[in-house]
Design a protein with these regions (language model features):
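A glycine-rich dinucleotide-binding beta-alpha-beta segment and adjacent secondary-structure elements
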Residues: 213, 383-478
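N-terminal Rossmann-like FAD-binding beta1-loop-alpha1 element of flavoenzymes
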Residues: 37-62
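Extreme N-terminal leader/targeting segments of oxidoreductases
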Residues: 1-37, 55, 474, 478, ...
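An anion/pyrophosphate-binding glycine-rich loop and adjacent beta-alpha core
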Residues: 275, 279-281, 285-383
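Rossmann-like flavin
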Residues: 96-166, 367-390
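Glycine-rich FAD pyrophosphate-binding loop
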Residues: 55-76
Length: 506
């Protein structure tokens, strides 16, 4: 079934200001529908929760506000951050273990990361990989061995910064980006498999159904919810639990302004429906949130070009080792450097990238001298010349003492020079509302490792669980591709099992 169009700005304001206050059970009367576990949102976290709850024997119903499953997960690249010794890693000749995986993720996910969740995720990663295989997700046993946002090949394994400084000094470099067998974006294939697995396990679905309010009984336990379906009010009784997997809040400008203003004015990585509805419904019951300022930011600077040249800020200065995971250089740029940002490359570097791997990226300016390029870019005279001269002097010796880019990407840049504008986007499509950046939110409801939504005292809100981007997962101030789909499904599964039994860990 086709997805309805993304909401207009006016519609998002109306939706944002609608009441999310909980409804008393005594005010409902007879419910229109009833089940044991009610899952709200049919992206990857919702599919995982529904699958596990149904497999545990619960009567499960999934509500999805769009016309079919998928959500923002289906529009993603489909990368899954998995490791610890999966069959794909072994087939590609890499030895990994949970402790090594943990050492990388603890650093890469940044300050204030949830180390308890990271530890569980790493220890359970091989089993989680097996679960994807059980759900019908296939992975090719081949490695994409160069920096990229997403391989256009069907390779099943990719590097996600593990082999770049400083992370290669903290953990043994092992690639952990697992990709479903698909050319290009694999999120759609991933969601086809996961949604089919959930319904195959026995979960029912109601699409075109938007949850609006949670229902509380006289003790304060979540007992169901109120929704709108085809313009009519519909009520749902959840005998055991409600699981919120409704996504983040990047499509809610008011919430962004309050919690994560760094994303204001940039593009949105979403299906247009990540408006924080689940977070708002839960907080209206007294639920707490965590890390609401944490975001993912993607700069449309092509890694294949960046690593062969340099990434500079608006003053012509390098600020990062360009072979690092591109999400890291994106955050460095947008959060900490004066824009605009430019990829500086020479003719040899540009031509060395296969045309199929250029993603339609073309230089905005090409000049014979750096002085001419500085003038075109509006940089201070001599700034870029100084940067390139310093870079070239050390690159001749295979060194990068300031930023530690790997020697295999180091060589002196020579005329003619080119500047590539990230704001032009890939395939000429523009990017980030003209800023060259787009992102999504990572903060959300405060949850236990079993998905129990916690209140401000740290106690569970009875009958309420959450996972995916509606919850605050493993992330601190950092992000790595595959950790959103990865922790959404991993902790979605835990939430589904806990919801089915009506409690958290014993």
């Amino acid at each position: 079934m086709s997805r309805p169009p993304a909401p207009t700005h006016h519609q998002s304001i109306d939706r944002r200001r609608s009441s999310v206050e909980p409804v008393a059970l005594s005010d409902i009367g007879e419910f229109d529908h009833a089940c044991d576990v009610l899952v709200v949102g049919f992206g990857c976290a919702g599919a995982a929760a529904a699958f596990e709850a149904a497999r545990a024997g619960a009567d499960v119903l999934v509500l999805e506000r769009a016309s079919g499953p998928g959500g923002s997960s289906a529009q993603s690249g489909g990368e899954l951050y998995l490791g610890g010794g999966t069959e794909v890693q072994k087939a590609c000749g890499f030895d990994d273990d949970p402790d090594n995986m943990y050492a990388y993720l603890e650093a890469a996910l940044g300050p204030n990361a949830d180390t308890e969740k990271i530890r569980l995720y790493c220890d359970g990663s091989v089993e989680h990989f097996a679960w994807f295989r059980e759900c019908g997700v296939e992975f090719n046993h081949s490695l994409h061995d160069s920096p990229t946002w997403m391989p256009m090949s069907e390779d099943g394994l990719m590097w996600l910064g593990e082999n770049s400084w400083p992370y290669n000094t903290l953990a043994r470099p092992v690639p952990r980006g697992h990709r479903p067998a698909a050319r290009g974006f694999g999120g759609g294939v991933l969601m086809e498999r996961l949604s089919a697995a959930a319904t195959g396990a026995g979960a029912g679905t109601h699409v075109d159904t938007q949850a609006t309010n949670l229902v509380l009984d006289e003790t304060g336990r979540v007992a169901g919810l109120v929704a709108r379906r085809y313009g009519k009010r519909v009520t749902y009784r959840a005998r055991t639990a409600v699981v919120l997997t409704t996504g983040g809040f990047v499509d809610n400008e008011e919430m962004l302004a309050h919690h994560a203003p760094v994303l204001l004015g940039h593009g949105k990585v979403s299906d247009g429906l990540d408006d924080g509805s689940g977070i708002r419904m839960a907080t209206a019951t007294g639920a707490a949130t965590r890390r609401m300022s944490v975001v993912e930011i993607a700069l449309t600077a092509l890694p294949a070009m960046v690593c062969r040249g340099m990434l500079v800020d608006g003053l012509g200065r390098r600020f990062v080792n360009e072979d690092v995971y591109p999400g890291h250089y994106s955050v460095h740029a947008v959060r900490h450097q004066p824009g605009p940002y430019w990829t500086i490359i020479d003719e040899e570097g540009y031509e060395s990238v296969a045309e199929a791997d250029r993603w339609g990226v073309l230089p905005k300016y090409v000049t014979e001298t750096l002085a001419e390029l500085e003038e075109s870019l509006g940089m201070p005279p001599g700034a870029l010349e100084t940067t390139v001269e310093t870079y070239n002097r050390h690159a001749e010796k295979g060194e990068d003492p300031y930023f530690h880019k790997d020697a295999k990407w180091l060589r002196p840049l020579k005329s003619p020079f080119a500047a590539i504008d990230p704001a032009a986007g890939f395939f000429g499509g523009g990017a980030g509302q003209g800023t060259g950046a787009a992102g999504f939110t990572l903060g959300g409801l405060h949850t236990s490792v079993d998905g129990e939504v916690l209140n401000h005292s740290g106690d569970p809100v009875p009958g309420l669980y959450a996972a995916g981007r509606a919850a605050s997962g493993m992330h601190g101030e950092g992000y790595v591709s595959g950790t959103s789909l990865g922790d959404g499904t991993f902790f979605g599964r835990r939430a589904g099992r806990a919801a089915a039994r009506g409690k958290g860990s014993e």
